[in-house]
Regions:
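Short, surface-exposed ligand- or partner-binding patches at beta-edge/loop junctions that are enriched
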Residues: 63
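Rhodanese-like catalytic fold shared by cysteine-dependent sulfurtransferases
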Residues: 1-23, 29-60, 68-103
C-alpha cells in the first residue's frame, strides 16, 4: 500500500492520544464535517492544510472518512518534522466501533 510508512492508530487509541495532548485534525470537506465529527477535533479541510499548519501542534492524529486523505496528511506532517498518525479506517471505523459523533 502507498501509505505503509504512515503510523496508524485504531479508534480505541485516539482518546488516549488526545488525553496526552495530541491535536485531532479532521481533514474532510465542510459537508462531511457537518454530517458528524469526533468531539474535540479541529476541522482543517485537506486543501487548507498548508496555510493553516500553525494551528496544529507537534503531535497530530489525522482523520478523514476512510483513512486515505488523512494518511496523506499524516505523511506530509511527518515529512515536515511533526509526529503524526492516521486514524485507520477514518470516521467510519470510529462510528463502526460504536464511538460517539457530534453533529
Amino acid at each position: 500500500m502507498l501509505f505503509d510508512d504512515v503510523p496508524s492508530v485504531g479508534p480505541s487509541e485516539v482518546s488516549a492520544k488526545i488525553s496526552d495532548g495530541w491535536t485531532l485534525v479532521d481533514v474532510r470537506t465542510d459537508d462531511e464535517w457537518a454530517m458528524g465529527r469526533i468531539a474535540g477535533s479541529r476541522h482543517i479541510p485537506m486543501d487548507q492544510l498548508v496555510e493553516r499548519l500553525d494551528e496544529l501542534g507537534d503531535q497530530v492524529v489525522c482523520v478523514c472518512a476512510v483513512g486515505a486523505r488523512s494518511a496523506r496528511v499524516a505523511q506530509y506532517l511527518n515529512a515536515q518534522g511533526r509526529e503524526a498518525v492516521n486514524l485507520d479506517g477514518g470516521i467510519y471505523a470510529w462510528a463502526e466501533a460504536g464511538l460517539p459523533l457530534q453533529t
